[in-house]
Amino acid sequence: MTKLNDKAPSLATTLAHLLRQEPELLSFDSARLANALWQRMADEKILTPRLSTPTNTQTYPYTEIVKAAAYLSHQSGLPGLAMTWLAQQRLIEIIAQCENSVIKDTYLADLIAGNTLSALAVSEPKVGAHPKHLNTRADKVGDTYRLNGEKTYVTNGLNAAFFIVFAITDVVDKRKQFTAFIVPKDSKGLSISPLHGFDALKPSTHCTLLLDDCELPDSHILGDIGKAFDDISKPFREYEDVMMLAPLAGAMQSLIDQLCAHDAELIANDNLGQLLAITESVEVLSSQAASQLEQANPHTNPISLIITGRLLVEHFNQTIKQLSAEQPLNDAIKRLIKDIEVLSNIAQSVNKIKQINLAIHYRQQELT
């Protein structure tokens, strides 16, 4: 991993200083999120590093954020922790940038202070997050909306104070129009259940939501009616695709460290050199992709960097699987191997589509 330079203060060095001074912040029950860590990061003004507030005018570029996320994942050995930090940053920005004063007045202060979390609820059972197949509806009844449907794989759902739920509010020319609703966890008609069979990426939690005539006033609408997919979901997915390379890079380095500490002879030098090279390459690709995301320039699309990074992680996983087969590994190492595999598989089908689109674009250019 990139060495941190205390003489050149950055987001990563500020985070490193905090964790060195208060190492207990990474010693928490893995079944729940590290609330104390979020609150202390908020105190140090690094919980939302891109969000300028009256008390915090210092903001950081995406390249600084991915470096800090890789460091957090490396030091904790918990890519789910860094994943949660990155996701919350973007969700908090969405709340902060919305024009709905009721939503901002109700939730923003606690989010920025690290006192609470939010959760994005888009995916549905058996169909994933593809808008064509989503079915959760929000029907207008008088001055309220009545939500019915089911959501799954809701990240941090068991720890969230509220959910950003996508629901169909109209169909125009056979295209479903989605609106985002703020649904408090104690809403009548909302049932929250742990996602059974999913045991990875702790301390993040995952759950399912059942909405059964869940009524909400129109003051709970986040953003424009019918535009949630284009305005919230697509930009969030682009952000997530780029930023999640960093927790992977940090976790991969943590796994190498733990395997070598567990058994110095487990990995031969040629294989170790390969794993280290892959990890460093993923970190570099993460930084380059983040830099392109910062530019928001259509001519500097980070898709190729993301695809390459994920292919490298896939090769890393295959090598680790071969090296660790039938080896007596401890629970922490087994958990980390699983976490890296699960995190790298998120949006794998979307990544495959991007590869195909690159090929199609190339062939079309060849014909012109």
Regions found by a protein language model. Give the residues of each.
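A structural signal for short hydrophobic beta-strand segments in well-ordered beta-sheet cores
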Residues: T136-D139
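Glycine-rich beta->alpha junctions and the first turn(s) of the following alpha-helix
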Residues: P194-V284
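N-terminal glycine-rich flavin-associated loop
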Residues: P79-V102
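A short, Trp-centered hydrophobic/proline-enriched beta-strand micro-motif
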Residues: L47-P49, A113-S123, F166
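C-terminal hydrophobic structural anchor segments
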Residues: E283-L329
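Amphipathic, small/basic residue-rich leader segments at the start of a protein or domain
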Residues: M1-W85, D263, L293-P298, I360-T368
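Glycine-rich phosphate/cofactor-binding loops in nucleotide/flavin-utilizing enzymes
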Residues: N317-T368
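A short core secondary-structure module
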Residues: E150-L190
